[in-house]
């Protein structure tokens, strides 16, 4: 794992992305040069072909990323990979045909190519990607050693790390053992507890650990010298909260304390440069999306009116940045008497109040499109924590520590929590989503926003977080 523009990324996933992007470029270049070499007579041949394939290669790589093929927990799940590559094939085939047909460089060459060429080309690209992944994972299993971590602690926090690593097998990190340093009640598996018969540094060297993670339930009275010795000898020393953030890409609210938030790095989304850049992107993207989606908006408006009488749009009060209330604008997806009792209700899975058209709009998130109006007005951003209703905010703020911190930024149409956590309607669900929201606020960057937008396409395809 390493940080790139403040966001934690899997080294294995990044390596695969670079290798597989190279494979995409190579296959496209080889196929076009083989079939079109006689026609490419004007200008340098290589530069002409590279210009021809640059945009298709970029789009294919984005589609592959957007379908979740670089999810660090599923890099070697080949059944999942094969299914996603088939989806990529279906998405990319018409795009490749369209891009090459409209390319003004080689119109004559395009005319002689049959649909079979495009089928073969697209299939070759994704077969190449699959073979590259198999080859990389086979070689990496033998040649690449995972980052070895020794956990100092055997109590509740250490047990959480054990459960995490048991649930999600990572190619990047290996827990080599747990040290019960201050004789706390052991909650991790006893075979994994190693005995410290000497210095902590010597034990770390014996186990080949490159990092110590301090996961002690009570650090009072624990000597610092062993950790200082390890640090001075080049072994990384990490707190439990930092390790959890790095490995899960969310914050652990149950172990979080204000001092960690105060002293940890990040939380730069409010600086002038970041705020100005984010707002500028929001305005440009909102105008572009509105122009692009106007035909769809017209069709959706007609369908909603045909199914049920009532207003096209639904305005609802939500809590925005700094606790200011605003009216969020969405396509209406429920019956007009959805809250006839006057008591706010969370939407539930298979909610009977949702219309048939509304169910489709929610599943595809088309109902969120009118929120570009809120983005243009400055009430919302494209990416950020989802805004909640005042009734729920008041309740959740009482029950969940740090809940109010999510209102430090503008709420978003999509967000880090929405693409990582399924839709939920309970306090525990809200707590889990807050852990992702605070991670986003802490580690914001423009690149992170772009990655979230791309991953939103993946969430829509899988109906992940659909209501």
Q: What are the residue ranges of the model-derived segments?
A:
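Short, glycine-rich, amphipathic interfacial segments at transmembrane boundaries or analogous
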Residues: 184-186, 244-257, 314-356, 414-433
């Amino acid at each position: 794992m390493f940080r790139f523009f403040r966001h934690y990324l899997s080294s294995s996933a990044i390596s695969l992305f670079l290798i597989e992007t190279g494979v995409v470029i190579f296959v496209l270049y080889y196929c076009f040069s083989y079939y079109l070499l006689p026609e490419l007579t004007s200008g340098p041949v290589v530069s002409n072909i590279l210009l021809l394939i640059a945009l298709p290669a970029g789009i294919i790589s984005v589609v592959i990323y957007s379908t979740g093929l670089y999810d660090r927990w599923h890099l070697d799940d080949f059944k999942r990979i094969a299914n996603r590559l088939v989806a990529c094939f279906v998405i990319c085939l018409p795009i490749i045909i369209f891009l090459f047909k409209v390319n003004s460089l080689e119109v004559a060459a395009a005319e002689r190519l049959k649909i079979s060429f495009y089928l073969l080309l697209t299939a070759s690209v994704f077969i190449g990607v699959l073979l590259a992944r198999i080859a990389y994972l086979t070689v990496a299993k033998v040649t690449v050693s995972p980052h070895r971590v020794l956990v100092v602690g055997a109590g509740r926090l250490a047990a959480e790390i054990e459960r995490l690593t048991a649930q999600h097998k990572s190619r990047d990190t290996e827990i080599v053992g747990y040290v019960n340093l201050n004789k706390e009640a052991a909650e991790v598996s006893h075979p994994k507890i190693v005995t410290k018969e000497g210095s902590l540094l010597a034990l770390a060297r014996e186990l080949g650990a490159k990092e110590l993670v301090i996961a002690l339930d009570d650090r009072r009275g624990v000597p610092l010298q062993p950790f200082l010795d390890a640090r001075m000898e080049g072994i990384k020393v990490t707190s439990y909260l930092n390790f959890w953030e790095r490995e899960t890409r969310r914050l652990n609210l149950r172990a979080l304390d204000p001092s960690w938030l105060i002293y940890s790095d990040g939380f730069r989304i409010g600086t002038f440069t970041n705020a100005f850049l984010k707002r500028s992107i929001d305005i440009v993207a909102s105008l572009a999306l509105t122009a692009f989606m106007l035909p769809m908006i017209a069709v959706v408006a007609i369908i909603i009116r045909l199914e049920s009488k009532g207003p096209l749009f639904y305005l609802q009060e939500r809590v925005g940045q700094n606790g200011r209330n605003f009216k969020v604008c969405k396509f209406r997806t429920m019956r007009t008497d959805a809250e006839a009792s006057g008591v706010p209700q969370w939407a539930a899975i298979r909610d009977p109040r949702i219309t048939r058209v509304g169910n489709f709009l929610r599943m595809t998130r088309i109902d969120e499109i009118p929120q570009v109006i809120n983005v243009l007005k400055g009430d919302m951003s494209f990416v950020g924590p989802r805004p909640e209703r005042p009734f729920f905010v008041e309740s959740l703020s009482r029950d969940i520590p740090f809940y109010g911190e999510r209102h430090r930024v503008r709420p978003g149409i999509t967000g880090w929590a929405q693409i990582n956590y399924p839709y939920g309607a309970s306090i525990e669900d809200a707590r889990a989503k807050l852990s992702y929201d605070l991670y986003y606020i802490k580690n914001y960057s423009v690149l992170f926003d772009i990655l979230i937008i791309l991953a939103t396409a993946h969430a829509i395809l899988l109906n992940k977080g659909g209501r």
